[in-house]
Amino acid sequence: MKYILSISCFVLSGLGLYAQPQIKIAKLKYGGGGDWYAAKTALPNLIAFCNRELGTNIAPEEDIVEAGSKDIFLYPYVFMTGHGNVVFTPSEAQNLRNYLISGGFLHIDDNYGMDKYIRPELKKIFPELELIELPFDHPIYHQKFKFPNGLPKIHEHDGKPPQGFGLIYEGRLVLFYSYETDLGNGWEDQRIHNDPEAKRQEALRMGANIISYCFTLAF
């Protein structure tokens, strides 16, 4: 199945991205017992930020899409998060592979605790690929907002630096994995984590860069 949304619906101008018609993005529902539903206010806040700062026309609420659903092909950007176990069935892994090689983009944000579970599951999707750390000069860090040192550190857990990993298929970044940063928590309502506003803005700006990259460069 070919990806049914075309990047041609996005018009670039000096002011940003203008989308016609309205585009929807989604959160991935997966099996294994992990809390795929975490960070409930994150995407609506990121969407509002992107619509305001980038001029996108993204629907204000995200959809929920299951890993094995053909509806995943409706979304140019799918977000995945959680703290725990992740399991993809063979058919789900094949569906995700088809989605990604057909033009889709998956952003995985480790909400702390997912890393040891997600890495073997990604091998089910792309057994031939390895996660690679993206260099700081990668375009995903240099959209409207500049991050010369890569991902910002939003929440501290064990003192490790934030890292951005990717899967690259035939020269195209199809999956971005943000690790040791907690971007999604930074997108949430301020009252939830009591993050300083400066940290929230860092997280939202980096999230906007990911959306911008997905919409304009990844296809």
Tell me the role of every PLM-derived stretch.
Residues 24, 29-33, 39-42, 115-191, ...:
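An acidic, glycine-rich "communication" segment
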Residues 18-77, 81-84, 174, 182-183, ...:
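Aromatic-Pro/Gly-enriched surface loop or interdomain linker
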Residues 60-67, 89-94, 159-163:
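Alpha-helical scaffolding within the catalytic cores
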Residues 57-65, 108-111, 129-136:
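Surface-exposed patches in mature extracellular/periplasmic domains of secreted proteins
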Residues 25, 77-116:
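Short alpha-beta junction capping motif
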Residues 4-13:
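Sec-dependent N-terminal signal peptides
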Residues 51-55, 101-104, 123-127, 215:
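Sec-exported extracytoplasmic/periplasmic mature domains
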